[in-house]
Amino acid sequence: MSDDIKKYLDGLLQKVSGLYVIQITDRDGVPLLRVSQEKNVDFALMPSFIPTFTTACDQASKLGLGRNKTIISMYSNYQVVQMNKLPLILTFVGAENCNTGHILALEHQVDGYLEDIKQAVTEA
């Protein structure tokens, strides 16, 4: 199943112009799956980067505007879109001019593939 998911995510990576990395981690930032283009985007793998998203989501939820599902940010010359799919965090890293709407549209396309990973993480 892991190869199917990886192949599917790699296909999505090719569909969105300027998208460099799709990474799935658990809530603590432990990488579970990663697909990337040739361009090296190391900052997305930094151990503190993903848990910072989790903390930011928790804090944003306290604003009284409802549950936070997505955070879009800029880092250097990169655009980072992180989605809260508890117990998973889905991270997309693209060029600063990458179409954010295209990245956000991928959310519903990957939901079906995430179910098996969610179940494995929950059982572990």
UniProtKB/Swiss-Prot annotation:
GO process annotations (BP):
cellular response to amino acid stimulus; positive regulation of TOR signaling; positive regulation of TORC1 signaling; protein localization
Q: How does it assemble?
A: Part of the Ragulator complex composed of Lamtor3, Lamtor2, CG14184, CG14812, and Lamtor4.
Q: Which InterPro entries match?
A: LAMTOR3
Q: What is this protein called?
A: Ragulator complex protein LAMTOR3 homolog
Q: From what organism does this protein derive?
A: Drosophila melanogaster
What the protein does comes down to:
Regulator of the TOR pathway, a signaling cascade that promotes cell growth in response to growth factors, energy levels, and amino acids. As part of the Ragulator complex, may activate the TOR signaling cascade in response to amino acids.
What's the encoding gene here? Answer: Lamtor3
As for family, the record states: Belongs to the LAMTOR3 family.
A single GO cellular-component term on record: Ragulator complex
Q: Which domain of life is it from?
A: Eukaryota
One Pfam family of this chain: MAPKK1_Int
Q: Which PANTHER family match?
A: RAGULATOR COMPLEX PROTEIN LAMTOR3 (PTHR13378:SF1), REGULATOR COMPLEX PROTEIN LAMTOR3 (PTHR13378)
Which SUPFAM superfamilies is this protein grouped with? Roadblock/LC7 domain
